[in-house]
């Protein structure tokens, strides 16, 4: 089956490379979302927590589609007297992924300095320590400062946030590698759905949520305000189709289509919605796979518990090496996710729960 809508590379690049760790989405990604979606909806607003809520008015049930715009990162907790930065994780950061990496230290909106993730060199470690993964007390960021005063003069202070210095690149024929595909590939998806959606049988709220990586916080507050009849979350999921992973633990595979979520740690998707999405995918020949993720959650986990409860489903884009600066996705899976979400909104009046 041929890809019907190839990825817009320049838009995807803009979305994934914009800064915005949890709680600091205003540093870049929030403005990108507003600029790219405003011409395809009737109203855009930013709520008190920072969620971008784009309303495309229509007749029919009220539907919320969430994609979180925050990314994992670091926060400065201490500046050493010799200028090195001590940091803490924002979201699920594995300290092994920090060593020998380049970082952007965000001094202000649109302004950063470079840093390098470092630890004690293996050459001078004890033999037993070389076998251990570093912990947070052994990691620091080197920004080239020679003193605490110099680091402060460069603009660094307690609470300064840090992202990987990553960029979007093609990887083979159909794949991309980038920083922050979790969850900017879903942000890209809702932008594309908003553009393509011509005849929605619903009152649609596209929501770029904040602070998902630290507890599904933006989805919880935005869903409370919207009070949707149905909810959908779009996120990445694990594609562990790599050497060394048993087949029953691979979760999903790159290039085999969008993943219709059955369950993750935060939600059991409404079975009627799961079956309905499957039927739509089959009817429109959209490639799909089924997903059960035993670790990790999504905004669906917050949406479905809103007020008296919201029937909720979720679509996932398979991704390798998530929570790193080299996450990998396949454009065919992205395309399938856009297609199925669009078809769902065009046919939502047929869903009966």
Curated annotation (Swiss-Prot):
Keyword Zinc belongs to the record: yes
EC number: 3.4.11.-
GO molecular function: aminopeptidase activity; metal ion binding; metallopeptidase activity
Binding site for Zn(2+) 1: 68, 182, 235
Record field: temperature dependence: Optimum temperature is 100 degrees Celsius over a broad pH array. At temperatures lower than 70 degrees Celsius, less than 10% of the maximum activity is detected. Highly thermostable. Shows half-lives of 24.8 minutes and 10.03 hours when incubated at 100 and 80 degrees Celsius, respectively.
Gene3D superfamilies to which the protein is assigned, alphabetical: Peptidase M42, domain 2, Zn peptidases
Enzyme active site: 212 (proton acceptor)
Domain of life: Archaea
Activity across pH: Optimum pH is 7.5 with Leu-pNA as substrate. Strong activity is still detectable at pH 6 and 9.
Summary of activators and inhibitors of this protein: Inhibited by EDTA and bestatin in vitro. Is insensitive to papain, antipain, chymostatin, leupeptin, pepstatin and aprotinin.
Enzyme class: hydrolase
Disulfide-bond pairs as recorded: none
GO biological process, one term: proteolysis
Entry similarity comment: Belongs to the peptidase M42 family.
UniProt-listed PANTHER family: AMINOPEPTIDASE, AMINOPEPTIDASE YPDE-RELATED
Name the UniProt record assigns to this protein: Tetrahedral aminopeptidase
Taxonomic lineage from the root: Archaea, Methanobacteriati, Methanobacteriota, Thermococci, Thermococcales
